[in-house]
């Protein structure tokens, strides 16, 4: 894998509007993290210096998107922003039908309710928290069919988002196609470290599912980033425009859920897309109950306007080169300093390998949760745990699910932070790495039923 | 001098064009929309009185909030602002943001409802009823008798029938999920609920240990009526009246798209810790994390500011008096109306306007189509299209009333727009004998009024 030269990712934009950052002292941060139960989700944004919690909804919009915001048509029914967005979704992604939702999980809720029956099995390229929760609420069970390399943080396999065709075939064999409403396919795979799927693999998955008459539902929240990796790393695609690859990826699937808060550069919004008339009809009946009338789906007209513009901007080759280039820059700095991170570097963040970072802590001491908390105390940098806390408990045994990957995600918001901010982050992680032996683990003192990572509370374990 | 003219307590800072089409163009649009104005494009509409929900003009202060919105995923400062404004207004400890009101309803009624449960309201609104019934529970309306009589001039026609409530609670206590007071009562004509009625309802609920939920999406408008119509309330500030109502309840749901003066957003407010925990779990799965609930930071800013602006004395005076202005003009023309005029809309009684159209041919929908054809005015039927059901034999069980709602968006239209609407009604009255009904040619399972198709009868 080639590292792009620094000049190649210079941002293809200049800054038009700024927002102040908050500087805090170590004492203030120590107090803030204690009050937040050592859960970075529970910190107040004013206590955070550099916020790498998520790339979701945190993008800087362009001046055109802000202009779109001003032109929002807030009519309850038939807003022109809806028709414009429908046209953009159809043209850029190729799906026939589209229903806006207030965000991605609204679309996940709809598709799970429409397609999943109790007892169904949904194979996918690694779970995602909210996706799995909706599948389970609808009575389904998620089965992981991602390639083994995805669970190995040190493997440098370039397409760790790929589906293992043998695993998928075995799941179909075991349960029968009738029990599988769809294959859940994510581009890129967030929980594996923002890893892409190759076009070759996707074509093979399409061929296999077609034989059995099984749908592919595409979690397309970072499809443009995935397409960029195909362009960069997969033989024969270097000269294809991003738009073209995105369209091909979508054409190999039957429907999609989209959180537009990632690729599409907006602060709120999502949609459900499908090529099937019957699924569309059913989902349109449900959307009025959960989200809003199907011509706004719980979104203000202005946010539909910003989304239509954001989708177009996300498919610009220069934009994407700078976006992924910035993430790679941070990753390469950390690799050069000997910090254990998930390899290769993904597209939306750098994932610290907490097991290797803190080898003295067993998984029961929540090493990734502890590392995220200590990184905040060290430098005011907010990251997110993606390990045993996020994985939740096994519904049958009640025990913790123990994922092979115990990660801390440093997620890079789009167009928000500069190279100097990335340097500060890298230095902070290096400082913490030097002091790693002083980090004690955590004890969980409050655990919610669903998606516990959002609200769980912890205390520090006493030092040795 | 004391002026009779009520002027807007603001001037216009930003405008949006509206399109003026011809009657021929509108006839084509209406046919393409299957005689359901919900299916019209907004650029085919001249005066959009479809709803007052999410259609307000925001203030300069709110737009500046849009610019400073903090889009942090967790712990956003804008959430901190909205939470403190809502907590201060409602007095409830737990505030959960939602992307709009129906999400707040779905979360709390999902927790309190389910198969066999019973919900009692002064009148359930369409999305509320759908939320409750899709979970397998039953929704029962018990407005006072005057609330069902379009001509009654009772000052608080939104009140709940307390005797009927007592009877239901005595007989069905175990089944009751919650008692819901919608203030003002939208379906019943935007009619207010008195503080005295809330007090009595609250006492009955507490006696039987049943939670009282206030649907507060128009509580500021309700407060105007309480202050001006209820004995002893004339010196109590609007905001204080609202606070007293909240103090009598156990929870509140709000669509901030009405009295929040926002284009998007809502919240659920709760007193009970355990219920709040359960609701937060559902919130995270279906809406978003607890500090944004599916809203952008900027929209939370706009709501925080809007909830403060809406209780301004001069704003409420303008708001209620300008709605009454349209009502009075139509009343003078002899248009049969829901009396007295409510807070956010004028409700025309289509059954009396078009006595020749039987209920199963939807007189309300006929008027909705006529207003669009004549003048590009978009309104909404609140009658048997919205609330009708079918019996076992497939015959229509009609709604109690056949109304057409002319909802006035907040701070959007001027007096001349309203004069244009009134003038259109002169024509409607002149041609009332020619009106024909419609039949439904296609309808979805839930909330059929949003997307049903119609064709004219005969």
Regions of interest found by a model, annotated:
Chain A
Residues 71:
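Aromatic- and Gly/Pro-rich donor/ligand-binding loops
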Residues 99-100, 382-385, 409-411:
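Conserved active-site loop/cleft motifs that coordinate metal ions or position small ligands
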């Amino acid at each position: 894998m080639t590292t792009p030269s620094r000049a190649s990712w210079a941002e293809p934009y200049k800054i038009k509007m700024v927002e102040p950052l908050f500087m805090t002292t170590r004492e203030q941060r120590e107090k803030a993290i204690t009050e937040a139960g050592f859960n970075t989700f529970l910190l107040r944004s004013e206590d955070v210096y550099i916020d790498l919690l998520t790339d979701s909804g945190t993008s800087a919009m362009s001046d055109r998107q802000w202009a779109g915001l001003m032109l929002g048509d807030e009519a309850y029914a038939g807003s022109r922003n809806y028709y414009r967005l429908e046209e953009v979704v159809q043209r850029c992604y190729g799906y026939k039908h589209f229903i806006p939702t207030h965000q991605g999980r609204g679309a996940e809720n709809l598709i799970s309710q429409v397609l999943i029956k109790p007892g169904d099995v949904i194979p996918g390229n690694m779970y995602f928290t909210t996706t799995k929760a909706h599948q389970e609420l609808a009575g389904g069970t998620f089965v992981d069919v991602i390639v083994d390399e995805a669970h190995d943080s040190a493997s440098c396999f370039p397409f760790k988002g790929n589906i293992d065709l043998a695993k998928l075939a075995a799941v179909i064999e075991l349960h029968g196609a009738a029990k599988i409403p769809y294959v859940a396919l994510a581009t890129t795979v967030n929980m594996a470290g923002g890893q892409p799927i190759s076009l070759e693999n996707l074509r093979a998955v399409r061929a296999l599912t077609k034989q059995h008459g099984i749908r592919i539902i595409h979690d397309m929240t970072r499809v443009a980033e995935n397409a960029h990796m195909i362009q960069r790393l997969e033989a024969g695609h270097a000269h294809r425009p991003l738009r073209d690859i995105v369209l091909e990826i979508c054409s190999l699937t039957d429907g999609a859920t989209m959180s537009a808060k990632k690729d599409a550069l907006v602060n709120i919004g999502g949609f459900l897309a499908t090529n099937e008339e019957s699924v569309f009809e059913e989902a349109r009946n449900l959307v009025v109950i959960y989200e809003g009338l199907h011509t706004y789906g719980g979104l203000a007209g202005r946010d539909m306007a910003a989304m239509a513009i954001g989708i177009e901007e996300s498919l610009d080759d220069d934009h994407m080169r700078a976006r992924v280039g910035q993430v790679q820059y941070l990753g390469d700095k950390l690799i050069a300093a000997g910090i254990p991170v998930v390899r290769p570097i993904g597209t939306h963040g750098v994932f610290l390998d907490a097991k290797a970072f803190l080898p003295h802590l067993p998984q029961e001491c929540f090493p990734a949760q502890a590392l995220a908390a200590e990184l905040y105390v060290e430098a005011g940098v907010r990251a997110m745990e993606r390990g045993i806390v996020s994985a939740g408990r096994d519904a049958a045994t009640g025990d913790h699910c123990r994922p092979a990957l115990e990660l801390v995600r440093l997620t890079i918001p789009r167009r928000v932070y500069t190279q100097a901010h990335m340097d500060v982050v890298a230095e902070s992680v290096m400082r913490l790495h030097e002091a790693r032996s002083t980090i004690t683990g955590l004890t969980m003192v409050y655990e919610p039923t669903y998606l516990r990572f959002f609200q769980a509370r912890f205390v520090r374990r006493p030092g040795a | 001098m004391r002026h009779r003219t009520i002027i807007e307590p603001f001037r216009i800072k930003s405008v949006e064009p509206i399109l003026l089409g011809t009657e021929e163009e509108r006839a084509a649009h209406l046919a393409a929309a299957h005689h359901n104005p919900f299916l019209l494009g907004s650029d085919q509409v001249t005066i959009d009185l479809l709803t007052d929900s999410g259609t307000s003009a925001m203030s300069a202060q709110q737009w500046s909030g849009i610019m400073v919105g903090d889009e942090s995923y967790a712990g956003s400062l804008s959430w901190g602002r909205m939470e403190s404004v809502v907590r201060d207004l409602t007095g409830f400890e737990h505030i959960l943001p939602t992307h709009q009101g129906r999400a707040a309803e779905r979360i709390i009624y999902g927790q309190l409802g389910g198969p066999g449960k019973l919900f009692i309201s002064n009148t359930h609104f369409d999305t509320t009823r759908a939320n409750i019934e899709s979970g397998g529970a039953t929704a029962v309306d018990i407005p006072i008798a005057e609330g069902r009589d379009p001509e009654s001039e009772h000052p608080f026609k939104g009140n709940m029938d307390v005797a009927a409530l007592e009877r239901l609670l005595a007989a069905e206590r175990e089944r009751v999920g919650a008692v819901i007071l919608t203030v003002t009562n939208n379906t019943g004509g935007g009619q207010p609920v008195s503080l005295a009625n809330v007090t009595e309802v609250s006492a009955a609920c507490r006696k039987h240990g049943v939670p009282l939920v206030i649907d507060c999406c128009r509580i500021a408008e309700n407060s105007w009526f309480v202050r001006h119509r209820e004995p002893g309330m004339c010196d109590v500030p609007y905001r204080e009246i609202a606070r007293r109502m909240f103090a009598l309840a156990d929870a509140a749901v709000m669509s901030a798209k009405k009295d929040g003066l926002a284009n998007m957003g809502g919240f659920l407010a709760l007193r009970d810790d355990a219920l709040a925990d359960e609701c937060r779990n559902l919130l995270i799965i279906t809406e978003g994390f607890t500090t944004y609930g599916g809203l952008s930071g900027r929209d939370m800013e706009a709501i925080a500011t809007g909830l403060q602006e809406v209780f301004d004395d001069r704003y409420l005076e303008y708001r209620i008096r300008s709605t009454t202005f349209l009502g009075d003009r139509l009343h003078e023309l002899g248009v049969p109306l829901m009396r007295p005029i409510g807070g956010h809309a004028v409700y025309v009684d289509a059954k009396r306007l078009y006595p020749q159209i039987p209920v199963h041919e939807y007189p309300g929908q006929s008027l909705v189509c006529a207003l669009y054809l004549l003048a590009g005015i978009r309104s909404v039927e609140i009658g048997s299209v919205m609330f009708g059901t079918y019996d076992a034999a497939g015959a229509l069980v009609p709604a109690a009333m056949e109304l057409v709602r002319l909802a006035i968006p907040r701070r959007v239209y001027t007096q001349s727009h309203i004069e244009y609407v009134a003038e259109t009604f002169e024509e409607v009255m002149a041609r009332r004998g020619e009106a024909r009904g419609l039949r439904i040619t296609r309808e979805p399972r839930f909330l059929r009024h949003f997307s049903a198709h119609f064709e004219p009868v005969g």
